[in-house]
């Protein structure tokens, strides 16, 4: 998890008792109120601007951390052929795979587990299933210090990525993905990487 700038913490503290003159905290207001509606619409607008999210993509703010998506993704996407392909590059992609395997036919198309997840595994497109409902990766692995520098070419199969550790740390071409998800508890961070043979 990254540190929030002091200015952000001070503003949040100041608005804890009275959000912009509303007489209440954000934690107290109804999610149906005009004040809260303006907050969520403003947050979505800023996220769309910063990430250059195309208009044909929806932005969802959901309860729970990114780990809840380990079940939500297969429950919502693994519906046609009940198949999904997973790249195991660390702890979180492995957890995502194990959870998804409870709901359908999940295939590990590449893994660097034998190398203690010290690198992103080599991908062989011949292992990718053209009838998979989606293809899942975890773009950045903070525990192991690895990151995808190039995205897999999945053809007509939607690419799904956990970007919890790298959201807003570098530009991402959102249009390359079917779904991107991230947990807010990691905050928005700066990510420093250097070229390495491990990548």
Q: Where are the predicted features?
A:
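N-terminal "arm"/small-domain region of PLP-dependent enzymes with the aminotransferase-like
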Residues: 1-30
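Generic secondary-structure signature for well-ordered alpha-helical cores
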Residues: 14-21, 45, 49-53, 102-105, ...
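Conserved N-terminal alpha-helix of the aminotransferase class I/II PLP-enzyme fold
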Residues: 21-69, 76, 90-91, 98-99
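Short active-site oxyanion
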Residues: 57-59, 82-85, 156-158
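PLP-dependent aminotransferase-like
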Residues: 67-135
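Active-site phosphate-binding strand-loop segment of PLP-dependent enzymes
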Residues: 100, 112-167, 179
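Conserved active-site segment immediately N-terminal to the catalytic lysine
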Residues: 160, 174-186
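Conserved small/polar residues in nucleotide/adenosyl-binding loops
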Residues: 192-199
């Amino acid at each position: 998890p990254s540190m929030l700038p002091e200015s952000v913490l001070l503003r949040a503290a100041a608005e804890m008792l009275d959000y912009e003159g509303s007489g209440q905290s954000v934690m107290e207001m109804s999610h149906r109120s005009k004040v809260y509606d303006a907050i969520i619409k403003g947050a979505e607008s800023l996220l769309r601007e910063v990430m250059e999210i195309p208009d044909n993509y929806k932005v969802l703010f959901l309860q729970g951390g990114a780990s809840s998506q380990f079940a939500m993704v297969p429950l919502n996407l693994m519906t046609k052929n009940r198949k999904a392909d997973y790249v195991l590059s660390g702890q979180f992609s492995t957890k995502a795979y194990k959870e998804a395997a409870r709901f359908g036919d999940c295939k590990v198309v590449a893994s660097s587990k034998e190398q203690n997840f010290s690198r992103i595994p080599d991908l062989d497109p011949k292992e990718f299933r053209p009838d998979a409902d989606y293809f899942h990766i975890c773009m950045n692995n903070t525990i192991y210090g690895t990151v995808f520098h190039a995205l897999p070419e999945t053809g007509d199969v939607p690419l799904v990525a956990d970007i919890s550790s790298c959201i807003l740390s570098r530009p991402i071409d959102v249009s390359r993905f079917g779904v991107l998800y991230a947990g807010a508890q990691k905050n928005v961070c700066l990510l420093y990487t250097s070229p390495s043979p491990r990548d």
